[in-house]
């Protein structure tokens, strides 16, 4: 049997980051933490994270939906269906369940990326800013070996 809880964590950006919806300095995330009562030392953790205005999840109902997940954690199939309008919570739940299956190792899938601990150098993100700031980011990402850059403009 599983038990669940969640905690909220506010990420503090190292630098203000421009998006099409404005400048981000902080971002809230919630961590869904599962524990198997048969193996209480093993935790599965999944991150539920949104960017307000860009994510379809309803922020006003977010924590009550997370509480609903915690109260109904042993009805996995029904939960996944009930979360259709909260894809970020659904993702966090699926991740936490996979982590429990992986004995809390955080190695959810066997892959070269996981085994070699090397980054996947695609989609280097370039944050919005003035021309010089963006050009410096582009130069750095290319030097790091990224083959595709995503510019926030």
Residue locations for each model-derived region?
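N-terminal capping/lid subdomain adjacent to the active-site entrance of alpha/beta enzymes
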Residues: 1-153
């Amino acid at each position: 049997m599983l038990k669940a809880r969640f905690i909220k964590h506010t990420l503090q950006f190292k630098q203000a980051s421009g998006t099409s919806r404005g400048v981000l300095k902080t971002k809230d995330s919630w961590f869904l933490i599962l524990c198997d009562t048969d193996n209480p030392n093993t935790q599965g953790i999944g991150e539920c994270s949104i960017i307000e205005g860009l994510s379809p999840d309803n922020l006003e109902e977010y924590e009550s939906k997370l509480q609903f997940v915690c109260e109904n954690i042993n009805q996995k199939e029904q939960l996944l269906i009930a979360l259709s309008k909260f894809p970020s919570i659904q993702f966090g739940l699926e991740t936490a369940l996979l982590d429990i299956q992986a004995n809390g190792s955080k190695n959810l899938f066997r892959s070269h990326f996981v085994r070699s601990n090397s980054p996947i150098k695609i989609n280097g993100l370039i944050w919005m800013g003035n021309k010089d700031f963006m050009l410096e980011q582009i130069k750095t990402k290319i030097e790091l070996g990224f083959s595709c850059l995503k510019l926030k403009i």
